[in-house]
């Protein structure tokens, strides 16, 4: 991902304030609610029968935290996202058979959740930088797909 020095600084500064536990669970939960077909990849998560069930599900929250911890690693390696996410790409492609379009959807949901949490601090410039990052991460995660 090509970011200017200002964009990198904006992304890093905001990310330092993110509560990964809270935002991760909320982002994954919103993905599962807004795009219910994505739930098929989470059969082992138990009750996903309603928005309240999804948002209160401890397995959704735990996996959301795991997802954002991986995203944090990506932010530390913006110049090598493909390398950073190579193993996760392989796992999601070969073993889990996740539709790579879902990575884009989750990235966009994450941007919305960040905007909701940070309000005016999430300026158009910060949003534009995050859109670049989530697009880069989605591309890296889709890299192993043929």
UniProtKB/Swiss-Prot annotation:
Q: Tell me which domain of life the UniProt entry assigns to the organism this sequence originates from.
A: Eukaryota
- Detail which positions bind heme b: 63, 92
Q: What are the GO BP annotations of this UniProt entry?
A: hydrogen peroxide catabolic process
Which part of the chain is the Globin domain? 2-146
List modified residues, type N6-acetyllysine. 59, 82, 144
Which residues are recorded with the post-translational modification Phosphoserine?
44
Q: How does it assemble?
A: Heterotetramer of two alpha chains and two beta chains.
Describe the family membership recorded for this protein in Swiss-Prot or TrEMBL. Answer: Belongs to the globin family.
What is this protein called in UniProt? Hemoglobin subunit beta
Source organism per entry reads Mustela lutreola
């Amino acid at each position: 991902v090509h970011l200017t020095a200002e964009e990198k600084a904006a992304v890093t500064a905001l990310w330092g304030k993110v509560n990964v536990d809270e935002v991760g669970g909320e982002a994954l939960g919103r993905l599962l609610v807004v795009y219910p077909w994505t739930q098929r990849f989470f059969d082992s998560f138990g009750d996903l029968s309603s928005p309240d069930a999804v948002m209160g599900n401890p397995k959704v929250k735990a996996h959301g935290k795991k997802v954002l911890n991986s995203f944090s690693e990506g932010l530390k390696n913006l110049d090598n996202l493909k390398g950073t996410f190579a193993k996760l790409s392989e796992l999601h492609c070969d073993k889990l058979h996740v539709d790579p379009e879902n990575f884009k959807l989750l990235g966009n949901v994450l941007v919305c959740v960040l905007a909701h949490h940070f309000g005016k601090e999430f300026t158009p410039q910060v949003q534009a930088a995050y859109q670049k990052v989530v697009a880069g991460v989605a591309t890296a995660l889709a890299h192993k797909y043929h």
